[in-house]
Structure formats: C-alpha cells, structure tokens
C-alpha cells in the first residue's frame, strides 16, 4: 500500500487518506490476500505533523483487516519519484546559492530507494513479519542541509547554503513551489513534516 494524498488541491488530505485506507481494506478483505505491506513514515515523535499523524491513522485502519499487515516506516527516500528527493535535486541543480529556512537543520535518516524495494520484497509472505511494524533507514543520520551538500558533491556542483532563523511555513512552501517541480499543496505538507526529526528507533528487520 503506497498511496498518499498530500498533493490533493481540494478538501482535507487527511480525510481523503482515511477514506482511501477504508476502501482499500474493505476491498482486500473480499479477496484471498494473506498479507498487506504498508510503506509508511517514521512516527517516533510525540508531536506529529499532519502528514505523519495521517500515516499513523492509516496504519491503524489497515491493521483492522482480516489479513496480516506489515508496516515499513521510512524517513526520506533517496531516489527518483520520491517527493523529498525531487526537492533536493531541484534545489541543488537550480540554485548555486541558497538562503534557506531553519528546517534544513532538522535531522533525518535517509534510505536509498533500492534498499526500500529490497525490504518491500523481502517481507512478502514472510510470516515473521506478519502484524509487525519496522522502522527502516540507511546508516547515516544527517540534516537536510547536509543532504543537499552531499548531493551537490555527487553531482560535481559547488553550492553555498545559508540558513535563516525565521521563515514561515507558508513562505517556505512558496519557496519550494516556485523553485521545484512539486505542487504548492505537497510543498506545504512536506514543509510541515520537515520540522520534525525522522530517525529510526530500531531496525530489527535487517536481522531477519
């Protein structure tokens, strides 16, 4: 289950995600499926963003089905198609100098998309993972500024980044909207989440 609705321009994305989860659960229960694998977000903060709170709510809905649920909770996924990665790539490739918001100092534990795919395929019909939740992440913990500079180094680009202490969520969202390829609604929801640490509390899945 890979669905999210943060890009929606109409209505409340949390309500839409809830409805989608209920519809999916009800449809799957009419089949002979033994397991559902849900790719969620790391939710180890006491105070959650709307995005991560919705992810947690969806997990609760999916777990109430007649099948076994396996939840993989990831932070920043590094790879084409990941909204967070698209932001990193667009910012680095378009801006030689950045005056950026303070959430660039927020710590996260990124994971490569190839590793996410390995985990997703590895838990399929693995009964040890039935009705279990796992945090998945790479070996490095870094902030968003470090991610930008690391990507710039890989691309062979020289970039300078200055972080300002004050920049509202709305202003940050417009900054991403005008510079990157993502929609304003997605930018706003992601900026809200980027103020919260996303670090694994454990990663026992790699031992299975």
What does each model-found stretch correspond to?
Residues 1-31, 41-47:
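NAD(P)H-binding glycine-rich loop region in Rossmannoid oxidoreductase-like domains
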Residues 3, 37-41, 73-75, 137:
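Active-site beta-alpha turn of Rossmann-fold NAD(P)-dependent dehydrogenases/reductases
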Residues 18-24, 54-65:
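Conserved catalytic Lys-bearing alpha helix of Rossmann-like short-chain dehydrogenase/reductases
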Residues 20, 83-84, 103-125, 132-135:
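Substrate-positioning beta->alpha
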Residues 30-35, 66-67:
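A short helix->loop->beta-strand "cap" motif at the edges of active sites that frequently abuts
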Residues 42-53, 76-82:
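Conserved catalytic-site region of short-chain dehydrogenase/reductase
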């Amino acid at each position: 289950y890979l669905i999210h609705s943060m890009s929606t321009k109409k209505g409340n994305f949390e309500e839409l995600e809830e409805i989608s989860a209920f519809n999916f659960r009800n449809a799957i229960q009419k089949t002979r499926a033994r397991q559902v694998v849900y790719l969620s977000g790391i939710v180890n903060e006491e105070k959650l963003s709307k995005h991560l709170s919705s992810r947690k709510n969806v997990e609760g809905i999916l777990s109430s089905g007649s099948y076994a649920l396996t939840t993989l909770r990831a932070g920043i996924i590094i790879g084409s198609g990941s909204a967070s990665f698209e932001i990193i790539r667009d910012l680095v490739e378009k801006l030689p100098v950045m005056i950026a918001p303070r959430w660039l100092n927020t710590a996260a534990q990124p994971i490569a998309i190839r590793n996410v795919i390995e985990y997703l395929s590895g838990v399929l019909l693995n009964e040890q993972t039935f009705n279990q939740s796992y945090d998945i992440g790479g070996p490095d913990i870094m902030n968003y500024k470090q991610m930008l500079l690391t990507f710039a180094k890989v691309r062979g680009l020289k970039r300078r980044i200055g972080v300002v202490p004050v920049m509202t969520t709305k202003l940050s969202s417009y900054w991403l909207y005008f510079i990157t390829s993502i929609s304003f609604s997605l930018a706003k929801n992601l900026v809200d989440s980027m103020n919260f640490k996303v670090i694994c509390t454990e990663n026992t899945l790699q031992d299975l």
